[in-house]
Amino acid sequence: MDRTIIAPWKAEEKEQSEKLHRKLQGLALVHPLPDELRKLIAWDMFLKPNQVAFVHVMHYLFRLLDPAEFKRRFFWPITDKKSEANFRSSTVEYLKHLNEKHQLHWANIKSYLVVMPGGMRFINFLLEFVGFVIQELIKQREKSLGLEAGTPNVSAKVMARQNAVMKEYASSYVVNLEENTALLRDKTQKIRRLMADLSADMGVPEEQLADDGFLDEFEATAALGVERVITQPTERKFDLEASLCGLKEAIDLFQVKQAENNQSKEAVEKALRGMRVLFDCDAVTEGDFYDPLGASKMDALLNGFNRISGTIAEQLDANDHYNESNAFVTTDLQALRVELSQSEVQLNNLLKKLNEPSKKDKGSANASGSARVQTLQPATPRFESVISSKFVSTPPIRIDMGGGGGRNAPVRLALQDDFNGKQFDALSNSLLAPAPPRSARKLKALDQSTGIDLNGTLNRSKINDPMQMLRTIHKNTSKVKAAPQANLSSLGSKWKQMQASFGFDEAPVPGAAVISPQTSPTDPSDPFTPLSGSECTRIERIPRTSENNTSLIAKSAAVIKVLEVSRNVLNLSTSPSGRLDALVPHTESHQQDVAPRLQLNDRTINDSLQLDPDFNIENDKNAFNVSHKFDFDQIGGEDDLQNISDSVLKDIIF
């Protein structure tokens, strides 16, 4: 058998299937297909049994034929096999109902058509059913059109007259159409000639000129050209007109102000001259401000305004910040006043504590009723026990000014004339030596240039060893030890010995001169403590380092310095303790001072000087600065002996 030859029945089946496909597509133009059926429609969909396509095609046709009947007879959509079997049985029953109702003479309605929907027989049956549905739809449409038109029954004569009129109208329409066609042909030729001319002028082919893209580009280019040539100049003219209108308004306002404030030429010249002098402007002539018509020149006025605008702006800015600066200064001054008041209160409290006498001073003042005893206020204030522990004071010195008649000779410090070089060591080892009798006293001749004659106090006093005085710093020295009385029976032998020890009988050495007191210049950068004009009590400050930052080193340095200076008994410029004036007066005026003067903290105390705690407090470096809050707990113990030169003679008993 030749497989290239197709059987005639298959060719007919294929032709019928294509015909069914075209009819379904025709129906889809008027009544769109559902989405599920649109996916299944094909020319060969029923060449083989296709149950899915059968269900969707019958659903589509039944709904077009009678939607109400379909809704009453069928259940849709199909969800399982049972509902699919019910749909097939309902389809057979509904087809039989349609066959009987419309006398369609469908003899091949059998169940196998719906059980195996495919093949030639099913395609032919489906073609007949689709034709029936189309006829029913046409009838329904004609019926609806007849109801809408409402055409009455017209006679044949009327219809003939209407037909004649329609023919004449059609004839005139044909003639008019021919004329329009000829005119359109002529215009088309003219357009072609113009396109040819444009193509020749522009060098662009006619096909490109006729292209829609080229026309769009040409239109855009033409729009840009119109904007550049017409729109932009117009906008610039509008802007210029607006600025001119604003300038005109300004000129009108200026003219109105000028009319209101019209001044004479002389007044304007005077005002401009004052402004020129005030702001240091260049010299301007009369012609620079006025033209022959008498009106002010705008450039000159603007120049003058520009000269003073900076100064005006600065002044306005200063005025704006004036209130702010005043508020700031006021706040600062209020804070300073509060701080000053607190400092004054603190200072007053401290001065009250410092000036308050102690119980011991009050008792000694009450016991001393004699007029010759004067209680001197110490230059350095008395502090509380906390402050007193931080300072080292020299021992009290008792000076008997009564003369001490008999064998009770007064006690005094050793002077230069009491010693010679070979007797210095013996004197250093002795603590107390009795004075020689009055008959054995011989004043040594001093330098005639000095002209000093010592009074009786020099020879009536006993000598205290300064080394012993330094050893009694921390001891109770309120009571002076009684000097040992010399034995009268041994005056014969011992008297000569004391005369020889003091060198009363020795002749004055030629060329010897008394050492005059020397003052040390004060230097702001001096490394010593600024306490005394003499160097005997000036303790050198030891720099704080890791090696010497101990209390032992500070104590040793201070003690060694004081001991070395105390042994310098040959210097009459100061006492061994450094607190007394030179015992040899300098001038004749000093000889009239009966009582010796004491120096407390670099101040000389006598009858004519009343101690004032505020005396020279600005330059006194020993005075406490009470402008700050004291915190004596922070004073280190390492500085106790560094301030040994700041000691105070607590008790002075005359």
UniProtKB/Swiss-Prot annotation:
GO cellular component: a single term: spindle pole
GO BP: any one term: mitotic spindle organization
Start-end of Polar residues biased regions: 365-376
Residue ranges the record marks as coiled coil: 329-356
Assigned keywords, A-Z: Cell cycle, Cell division, Centromere, Chromosome, Coiled coil, Cytoplasm, Cytoskeleton, Kinetochore, Microtubule, Mitosis
InterPro entries to which the protein is assigned, alphabetical: HAUS_6 (IPR026797), HAUS_6_N (IPR028163)
Region of interest: Disordered: 354-376
Primary location recorded for the protein, binned into one broad class: cytoplasm
Superkingdom assignment: Eukaryota
Gene Ontology molecular function: microtubule binding; protein-macromolecule adaptor activity
Extent of Basic and acidic residues compositional bias: 354-363
Subcellular location: Cytoplasm, Cytoskeleton, Spindle; Cytoplasm, Cytoskeleton, Spindle pole; Cytoplasm, Cytoskeleton, Microtubule organizing center, Centrosome; Chromosome, Centromere
Additional information: The name 'dim gamma-tubulin 6' derives from the decreased gamma-tubulin staining of the spindle pole seen following RNAi-mediated knockdown of dgt6 in S2 cells.
Role noted for this protein: As part of the augmin complex, plays a role in centrosome-independent generation of spindle microtubules. The complex is required for mitotic spindle assembly through its involvement in localizing gamma-tubulin to spindle microtubules. dgt6 is required for kinetochore fiber formation, mediating nucleation and/or initial stabilization of chromosome-induced microtubules.
Complex formation: Component of the augmin complex composed of dgt2, dgt3, dgt4, dgt5, dgt6, msd1, msd5 and wac. The complex interacts directly or indirectly with microtubules and is required for centrosome-independent generation of spindle microtubules. dgt6 interacts with CENP-meta, gamma-tubulin, msps, Ndc80, Nuf2 and tacc.
Family from the record: Belongs to the HAUS6 family.
Entry protein name: Augmin complex subunit dgt6
Organism per entry: Drosophila melanogaster
Lineage of producing organism: Eukaryota, Metazoa, Ecdysozoa, Arthropoda, Hexapoda
